[in-house]
């Protein structure tokens, strides 16, 4: 007992000294910009390692966003590893068991796969507990506030409400020493051996370190439905038709989020046609299940329409001494599959392992940190490449714009109808349960081959030779959908 008390005293003294350095000199082991999904997770993980952390956030008010409201099972598992799973409590979170895909009115239930001790899924499901995994859906703002409360409880983390405005650089080495900020209207500065930029999809610092920019070809427009009568409660709903996809999922006991994808320059959503409300009323409502229409129509009349760009940005290797970009500032994919938070939490888990004090005692050891970031860049791809590629490929199919893509869309739905591994594999990938890129490759081309077969045999007999020839175009379209995103992952 004496030994334990004696060893605890120096640690407590170090903790007090570190806090004094943060409070008086604004100096820490790590400065993190952005107390969002990734920033909170990373701050808490590093604080638990005994690192001294300053977390900057421009506003600690509860955010009001329309994305970041569905956490896949792989994200729930990562939250557990971070010791933050209790953040899903007391926010009226809804259990999510899978998806209900509705294709021109026909439904297929897609449940997350059972992870049994002796199953093939178990072999592919790295780190997922035995049993049937569950996701969670919730109000984004409530979840963020719970994450922030968790971080505030960590004695090694100081949360500061301030707006980061610029980076502090060493004049001789050009390495990053910290950030300049505005706090309570006054200029200030915060210094760390490592600066982590996690300021979200619209990062003000990203363009200083990357020449490329996020690619966005559509927006999600959002409504909040009250007491909607969903076809399959506790499931995400994906509605497919001759227009872009529609998502429906509960975010509370009484609230359901509706996300409507509207591509750029869509005629029915143009100002001349009456704008987005015209598109929602005259194009979207008729495509909804009849039981959902009353709540949807009421939301159109009641809600202020809000939107978010659907962006794609492949990750790049961090090479700047003293600074790393992470979260949406580093990597984004289409939010159709709800994979963003799962990627963020798993990145925090992996990075905390690579930054373990037993491996990197001091985070101002820039050579060691950059070496760890090279490892991080490639190790994360078992999960992130799968989620990134799947999100982009599924969006291309679900928002089919030509005959070949519509053939692939139909083939995808028929593939789901086969059940068994034809459901377990794809939804296991989407849920962050299966983390093997080859499994994605296998299922995608299984869908492509089924699509080609259906394209040939479901036409008129007299057109069989023509459709057989046209099937080549379907195959090449499948390659055109998938391979650019594979190359983007490899190139980055």
What kind of region is each of these model predictions?
Residues 21-38:
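Beta1/beta-strand and adjacent pyrophosphate-binding region of the FAD-binding site
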Residues 33, 47-67:
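Glycine-rich FAD pyrophosphate-binding loop
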